[in-house]
Amino acid sequence: MVKVGILGAAGYTGGELIRLLINHPEAEIVFANSESNAGNLVAEVHEGLYGETDLKFTAEMPFDQVDVIFFCFGHGKSEAFLKEHNVPENVKIIDLAQDFRLAPETVVVTQQPTPAAHDFVYGLPEINESKIAVAQHVANPGCFATCIQLGLLPAAKMGLINSDVSVNAITGSTGAGQKPGATTHFSWRNNNM
């Protein structure tokens, strides 16, 4: 049984992860961390889990009781968390945010700075299964990257892609997480393409 800790468990990603893990035969959720919801039932925040679990959010982070922790923070918070907290080396980390998705040597101009150095392995099993299997730190790819890579991978393996590929992708309102922003509110995104 893999013992799991979830940080940032009250957000959309945390809720979906809890939903996937509560009935997983090989996983046990030891803690679901959310400082703002500590003491509340998970199902009070993630209403779709009502009747599925009696798990409560906690402000505690007992790393010594888990085998793996999932970072379900907003983008840009995972790196800061690792700088501020001492996670034992034997605890695996799977980051579901964007902080460690790109290799340190990748030069990308974005609104979010890429960490200067890290040892996270790109976590798309269809292309990186052997490295993920032995990795201590895994960076889960984003929804667009996953969709594009899984869609193109069969054609690429068969040598059918002979030129650049252009992708037009559209995201829903939940793609930016729960925290409101000027361009992420439903009223801004609704019927706005």
Positions of the model-derived regions?
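N-terminal Rossmann-like NAD(P) cofactor-binding subdomain of oxidoreductases
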Residues: 2-193
